[in-house]
């Protein structure tokens, strides 16, 4: 009998396809589809470690979107974009700017005669490389422990994608129980999705809007009360259920007493000019204010109290950056240089800090050649997107489909072991698309789910060391079939250490 040959595919030649557990069972075109789809997929909030891993997930996890320390540096100052004091109650993570001295350049070395160099690294709260889809950064312990005077090595990760877990594994999707069947809904690459699975697979969307107002129209008090005038939601707060973020009202002579009553200013009417977010359950994540007075303030007193608070917070942020720069200048005189990012930040700060009194040079803020209104507020908000009809799903084998229906959990098929189907798809497409490895993954995952259930039930009934060893050896026999190399690795482990842990 001929001996079977084992061919090893080199990960360096497979590139992204090395994340596929069964690349030998996928046609070239389908493998290429997986490579393109994984770059288009947004991070899933319920992401999981893949059940059948290739060993390359952690390596790819090193190159996902991250905020890293660019050089070996010593922290000079940590500046939060919004300070902790004040009257605004911010209930959300806030951006942070870290000022550091580059210890690989100039003043960081006795042998290097170049001047000391200082730079900044900005830790944002979210990443948005798409006009809608993005994710909230997860700050690492290194970021949470930043303080003046400590040294940070180059490439220290300060914030990472939520797709990376604490072990460094790249979780680019979510495991699913897939049923291949001849349901009428799954024709033409249709997919039926379990509602509970969809709810656990949400991803982040973002929206932006710019609001402007001055004395011609008054901003409404849509988020305040009789004592607090609040014209838009604060950072971390949800947008109203009707989606109105901000609205202004044009005053009509003779109707001022009606239009400007406390109750009227807290009510949005169809005749008002409103900025509306179409997405549900949206939450504000960023507010940026530009104040461009054209002489005497035109907005009625008190109606601009909220944007003035944000303006003051912005000025405090830039004042602290300027203070850090002044401290560097006092220590080093003129014998230092700034990174382009730090230089640009200071210039932007001067624009925000300049006074607008009569004895100072005025700055004119324009957009597309036209002067801005007295107040301009840029609001960024985030919201959860739940997969639903019209969304596209894909797997590691180039298998894909469009959701045509979402069924309640109790309507989905259940197998003899009580496993509920998460996704229903057409099995015939596997033959048509030449990606039979889809069935490999489904069958092996189902087999090991049953194996796991059997082992757990057996150990519950008999927790002796003898039975534990028996179940361990039985599991090794399954590994011998699926991955002999992995089985050899597991055999080197003392199974009884698991009992102690």
Question: What would you call each of these model-derived segments?
Answer:
Residues 176, 185, 192, 197, ...:
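Intein-associated homing endonuclease modules of the LAGLIDADG/DOD-type, together
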Residues 125-129, 403-420:
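Flexible glycine/proline-rich, aromatic-decorated loop/lid segments
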Residues 440-501:
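Long C-terminal interaction/binding lobes of large macromolecular proteins
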Residues 151, 238, 280, 386-389, ...:
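Helical mechanochemical/support elements of P-loop NTPase systems and associated helical scaffolds
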Residues 184-186, 252, 291, 399-400, ...:
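Conserved nucleotide-binding/hydrolysis micro-motifs of P-loop NTPases
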Residues 379, 390-392, 400, 404, ...:
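Single-stranded RNA-binding surfaces
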Residues 251, 409, 445-449:
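Short, well-ordered loop/turn and helix-capping segments at boundaries between secondary-structure elements
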Residues 1-387, 392, 497-501:
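Long, charge-dense accessory insertions within large macromolecular proteins
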């Amino acid at each position: 009998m001929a001996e079977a040959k084992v061919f090893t595919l080199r990960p360096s030649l497979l590139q992204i396809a090395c994340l596929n557990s069964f690349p030998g069972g996928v046609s070239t075109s389908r493998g290429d589809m997986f490579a393109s789809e994984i770059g288009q997929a947004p991070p899933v909030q319920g992401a999981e470690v893949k059940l059948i891993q290739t060993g390359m997930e952690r390596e790819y996890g090193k190159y996902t979107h991250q905020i890293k320390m660019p050089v070996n540096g010593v922290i000079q100052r940590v500046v939060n974009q919004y300070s902790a004091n004040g009257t605004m109650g911010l209930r959300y993570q806030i951006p942070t700017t870290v000022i550091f001295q580059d210890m690989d350049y100039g003043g960081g070395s006795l042998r290097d005669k170049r001047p000391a160099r200082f730079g900044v690294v900005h830790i944002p709260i979210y990443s948005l490389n798409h006009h809608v889809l993005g994710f909230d950064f997860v700050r690492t312990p290194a970021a949470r422990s930043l303080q003046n005077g400590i040294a940070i090595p180059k490439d220290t990760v300060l914030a990472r994608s939520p797709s990376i877990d604490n072990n460094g594994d790249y979780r680019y999707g979510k495991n699913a129980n897939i049923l291949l069947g001849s349901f009428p809904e799954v024709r033409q690459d249709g997919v039926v999705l379990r509602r509970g699975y969809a709810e656990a697979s949400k991803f982040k969307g973002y929206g932006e809007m710019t609001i402007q107002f001055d004395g011609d129209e008054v901003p409404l008090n849509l988020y305040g009360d009789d004592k607090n005038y609040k014209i838009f939601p604060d950072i971390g707060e949800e947008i109203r259920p009707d989606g109105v973020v901000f609205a202004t009202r044009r005053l009509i002579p003779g109707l001022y007493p009606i239009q400007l009553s406390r109750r009227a200013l807290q009510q949005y009417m169809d005749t008002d000019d409103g900025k509306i977010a179409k997405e549900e359950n949206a939450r504000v994540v960023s507010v940026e204010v530009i104040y461009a007075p054209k002489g005497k303030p035109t907005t009625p007193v008190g109606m601009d109290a909220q944007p003035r608070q944000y303006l003051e917070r912005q000025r405090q942020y830039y004042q602290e950056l300027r203070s850090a720069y002044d401290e560097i200048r006092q220590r080093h005189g003129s014998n230092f240089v700034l990174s382009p990012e730090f230089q640009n930040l200071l210039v932007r700060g001067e624009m925000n800090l300049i006074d607008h009194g009569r004895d100072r040079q005025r700055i004119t803020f324009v957009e597309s050649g036209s002067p801005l209104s007295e107040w301009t507020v840029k609001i960024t908000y985030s919201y959860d997107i739940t997969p639903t009809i019209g969304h596209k799903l894909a797997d590691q084998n180039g298998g894909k489909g469009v959701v045509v229906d979402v069924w309640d959990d109790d309507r989905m098929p259940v197998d003899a072991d009580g496993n509920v189907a998460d996704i229903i798809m057409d099995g015939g497409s596997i033959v048509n698309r030449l990606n039979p490895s889809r069935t490999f993954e489904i069958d092996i995952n189902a087999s090991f789910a049953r194996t796991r259930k059997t082992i757990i039930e057996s150990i519950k009934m008999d927790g002796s060391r003898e039975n534990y060893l028996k179940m361990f050896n039985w599991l090794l026999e399954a590994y011998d079939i699926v991955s002999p190399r992995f089985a050899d690795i597991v055999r080197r482990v003392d199974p009884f250490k698991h009992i102690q842990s």
